[in-house]
């Protein structure tokens, strides 16, 4: 196939993605789960086993020492600190985007969001390196 034919197909896909909305674009160019090395203090309970266990735009990803539903388009490190609704007492780390550092907080054990890491090093691996690139 000539280069002009290839470029024409790419332009067509781009136009279709705008007309059909994000679902066609997601099928053609699927998003991936975040990848980084993590040294877990303990394995967390899996909250999903496959993508269809998750809400529509989320994928079942190995993340932060367990499987969790994540939206690959969402910047986890920009989420606010969220202790959750339960009354347990877990020392965790969250990434504070305002000062680009990982900070300790107390997690209640349920709900909350994915800006919630077992250790400072996992938080730094997931967020600080990415923050320094932007």
From Swiss-Prot:
InterPro entries hit by this protein: Elafin-like_sf, Kunitz_BPTI, Kunitz_BPTI_sf, Prtase_inh_Kunz-CS, Serpin_venom_toxin, WAP_dom
A molecular function (GO) term: serine-type endopeptidase inhibitor activity
Signal sequence bounds: 1-21
Renumbered residue ranges of the record's region Interaction with SEMG1: 102-133
Domain spans labelled WAP: 26-73
Subunit note: Monomer. Homodimer. Homomultimers. Interacts (via C-terminus) with SEMG1 (via 164-283 AA). Interacts with LTF. Found in a complex with LTF, CLU, EPPIN and SEMG1.
A Pfam family: Kunitz_BPTI
Cysteines joined through disulfide linkages: 33-61, 40-65, 48-60, 54-69, 77-127, 86-110, 102-123
Tissues expressing the protein: Expressed in differentiated spermatogonia in testis. Expressed in spermatogonia cell lines GC-1 spg and GC-2spd(ts) as well as in the Leydig tumor cell line MLTC-1 (at protein level). Expressed specifically in epididymis and testis. Expressed predominantly on the postacrosomal region of mouse spermatozoa, in Sertoli cells, Leydig cells, and round spermatids in the testis, and in the principal cells of the cauda epididymidis epithelium.
GO aspect biological process, one term: negative regulation of peptidase activity
Main localization category: secreted
Region (Interaction with LTF): 117-133
Localization: Secreted; Cell surface
Entry protein name: Eppin
Sorted UniProt keywords: Antimicrobial, Disulfide bond, Protease inhibitor, Secreted, Serine protease inhibitor, Signal
Gene Ontology CC terms: acrosomal vesicle; cell surface; cytoplasm; extracellular space; protein-containing complex
Originating species: Mus musculus
BPTI/Kunitz inhibitor domain location: 77-127
């Amino acid at each position: 196939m000539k280069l002009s034919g290839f470029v024409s197909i790419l332009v067509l896909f781009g136009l279709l993605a705008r007309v059909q909305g994000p679902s066609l674009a997601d099928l053609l160019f699927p998003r991936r789960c975040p990848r980084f090395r993590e040294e877990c203090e303990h394995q967390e309970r899996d909250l999903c086993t496959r993508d269809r266990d998750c809400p529509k735009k989320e994928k079942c990803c190995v993340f932060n020492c367990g499987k969790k539903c994540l939206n690959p388009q969402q910047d986890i490190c920009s989420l606010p600190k969220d202790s959750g609704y339960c009354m347990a007492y877990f020392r965790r780390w969250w990434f504070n985007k305002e000062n680009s550092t990982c900070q300790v907080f107390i997690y209640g054990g349920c709900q909350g969001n994915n800006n919630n890491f077992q250790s400072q090093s996992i938080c730094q691996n997931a967020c600080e390196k990415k923050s320094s690139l932007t």
